[in-house]
Design a protein with these regions (language model features):
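Short Gly/Pro-enriched turn/cap motifs at secondary-structure boundaries
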Residues: 62-67
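Outer-membrane beta-barrel channels and translocator barrels
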Residues: 69, 80-81, 117-121, 198-202
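Beta-sheet entry/capping signal
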Residues: 73, 84, 202-207
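N-terminal entry motif of extracellular EGF-like repeats
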Residues: 57-59
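A beta-strand signature from Gram-negative outer-membrane beta-barrel systems
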Residues: 1, 69-71, 84
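Residues on the lipid-exposed face of transmembrane beta-strands in outer-membrane beta-barrel proteins
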Residues: 74-80, 112-116, 191-197
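Surface-exposed loop/interface segments of Gram-negative outer-membrane beta-barrel transport/assembly proteins
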Residues: 1-55, 92, 96-190, 206-208, ...
Length: 248
């Protein structure tokens, strides 16, 4: 960053003092006297990115190294010459890649098939597929979060050097993630009714009706994010945050 600003004739972004602190921090991360950040001169807030000297891997901070996915299926079938049936049950869990928050999908499905054949020239078929999707994640649209993580400066700290509940700074996306929650519950049912008449061998007359309905419930909860100033006072973070609203 300094080299770029120098090339376009502007003053350095990082002072030499900050660069020296960065080098010390690399040797002794968060060691004594190296909190990664200090208060501004008025002690009313924390210094900005140009004065911080941490070494944060934001991808490692927010993302898991791996995610769990598992599926379970059970089916039964049977019948006679006149009636046959099939019932299949399934469950799938897919964990997301975000590490700090709930980020998952639960999927349940029931698939049933029935056939009734009263005689050689007539048969009835009924198929029904019900699916329930349960999604839990911080935001309806996660793209803004992924964008913000990718552009976070590595020299900025994840926490301010004050113990307590509100020690996440305003530039850490986790502050906002911890105060939002989105859930989507969606049930879908697709049904097919069919009747087949065979007046002559090789000649099938088929009547079919398909019905589908979807019911979806979305819920978005948002709380007030708070952070702590250097003097220990709690501050409400009220500035609008892009993407942290419904529908996203």
């Amino acid at each position: 960053k300094n080299a770029y600003r120098s090339a376009i004739g502007e003053s350095p972004y990082f002072s030499q003092e900050t660069i020296d602190l960065m080098n010390q921090f690399l040797q002794n991360p968060y060691g004594e006297g190296l909190p990664g950040i200090t208060a501004n001169q008025e002690n009313t807030g924390w210094r900005g990115g140009e004065s911080q000297y941490a070494n944060t891997d934001w991808f490692d901070y927010f993302y898991k190294n791996k995610s769990l996915r598992h599926s379970h299926n059970l089916s039964i079938s049977g019948g006679s010459d006149k009636v046959t049936y099939y019932v299949g049950l399934g469950y799938t869990y897919q964990g997301g890649l975000l590490d700090r928050v709930e980020d998952s999908l639960d999927k349940y499905n029931v698939n049933t098939k029935f056939q009734i054949k009263p005689n050689d020239w007539l048969k009835f078929n009924f198929n029904n597929n019900i699916t329930l999707n349960l999604i839990s994640r911080p935001l309806p649209d996660m793209s803004i979060l992924y964008h913000q993580i990718a552009r976070s400066q590595p020299n900025m700290v994840t926490e301010v050097p004050i113990s307590g509940l509100y020690n996440l700074p305003s530039w850490n996306e986790a502050l906002y993630l911890d105060n939002v929650g989105y859930s989507q519950n969606r049930i879908s049912d697709a049904m097919t009714f069919a009747a087949t008449v065979t007046p002559l061998k090789g000649w099938d007359i088929i009547g079919e009706m398909k019905v589908r309905f979807d019911v979806q419930n979305d819920e978005f909860l948002q709380k007030q994010p708070r952070t702590t100033r250097p003097d220990g006072t709690i501050e409400n973070v009220t500035a609008p945050r892009q993407g942290y609203s419904y529908p996203g």
